[in-house]
Amino acid sequence: LGGIVLSLDLPTGRRLWEKDFATDQTSWIAGDWVFQLSTDQQLAALSADTGQVKWARQLPPFKNMKKLTQPIYWWGPVLAGSSLVLVSNDKQLATVNPTTGEITNIIPLPAPAAAPPIAAEGKVFVTLATGDLLALG
């Protein structure tokens, strides 16, 4: 997959910047930063003003890294409190420091996630492949 992430000036439609970045996830914009997850499971923080990459963090892309089998698919990120939150089809919820990109916690889920997490009312909601909805926080 190919693709770009870009910033537009809404009143004029003028393209401010663009980055080659294959993604199928929605960007999360917070303050001066755009947080984006690529199709190869790399999470990045881009400057909203310039598109410059502040940090990039590779999330685990495979369960078996030696054989490169059993792909892990991540959804997100969303900003919940002071952490970025992502979920995976490998029954994991990851929290990431938005300033440094450091993975601060991996929390097991009872089943694979099936969609991006949602942050609302001080909680993170996770839809599982079983059809259950978890409310965390």
Label each region the model flagged.
Residues 74-98:
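C-terminal hydrophobic structural anchor segments
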Residues 9-12, 47-50, 97-101, 137:
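Short loop/turn segments that connect beta-strands within beta-propeller blades
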